[in-house]
Amino acid sequence: MAIRKEIGIIIQSKDIGESDRLISLAGETQVRMNFISKGIRKSKRRAIISTELGCLVEVDYYDQVEKDWKSTKEIHLIKRYDELKKDYVGTLFVLYLTELTSQLYPDGENHPFLYQLLSGSLEVSNENGFRKEILPFFKLRALTHMGHFPTEFYCHTCGEEVLTKAKAYFSVDSREFLCSDCHPITKDHLPVLKLFHTMLSKKFSNVLVIFPKEAEYREGDMILNQFLRSLLGRELKSYFEFYKTIGDL
């Protein structure tokens, strides 16, 4: 039986029976798959930490085409992001980001961009500490890549770019941009929409320089959270504790 390798971030980890654990990766090259590590929870040789959420791992697995999951030969821990996980907020951030990625990443599909986005977000947060500003950046990049959020900022009514208008609004319900020339705008989203537009074309560090005000990121994150509720039909399990802890609930 052929042995294959995959590198990725663990976005789902759950116990099976008394000693097994099932994990799922946002992988570097392969489609999203489930891997079972038999007996790892009782093993004295294999480290259970290698199946922890948010860890960067390399999995050696048996390529069993007929099964819904792959049996692992070995799981090698590459990086745990210890600096990020050493405090409560950082740990909650990892749990939130991995759950969000898991919800957006369908089984059997191949999205290496999500792996790059997730690993990059964890890496920069591990090096520089968690910043709230990364939340809307991650969500917007992930949602646009998966085709859920529009990437062109044109008014649904007149077809002109809303970024050039006096005011603009994003309707979560209809997932459309509206401009002040065509509609009365009771809540102006224009500063946030300009932030979104920049996020889609610049690195996170550059976005922070161009848009230094935290309030714009907070409002952008609120809009994207509303969008996620509409898209998923529910709140993420990790949402309440995470947002309560960072003071944005």
Swiss-Prot record:
Q: Which UniProt keywords apply?
A: DNA damage, DNA recombination, DNA repair
Function per UniProt: Involved in DNA repair and RecF pathway recombination.
- The reply on keyword DNA repair is yes
Its recorded name reads DNA repair protein RecO
Organism, as annotated: Leptospira biflexa serovar Patoc (strain Patoc 1 / ATCC 23582 / Paris)
Task: Report the NCBIfam families cross-referenced here.
Answer: reco
Q: Which domain of life is it from?
A: Bacteria
Entry keyword annotation includes Protein transport: no
Q: Do you know which InterPro entries this protein is assigned to?
A: ARFGAP/RecO, DNA_rep/recomb_RecO_N, NA-bd_OB-fold, RecO, RecO_C
Q: Looking at the UniProt record for this protein, which Gene Ontology cellular component terms does it annotate, in alphabetical order?
A: bacterial nucleoid
UniProt-listed GO biological process terms = DNA recombination; double-strand break repair
Query: A Pfam family this protein belongs to?
Result: RecO_C
What family is this protein classified in? Answer: Belongs to the RecO family.
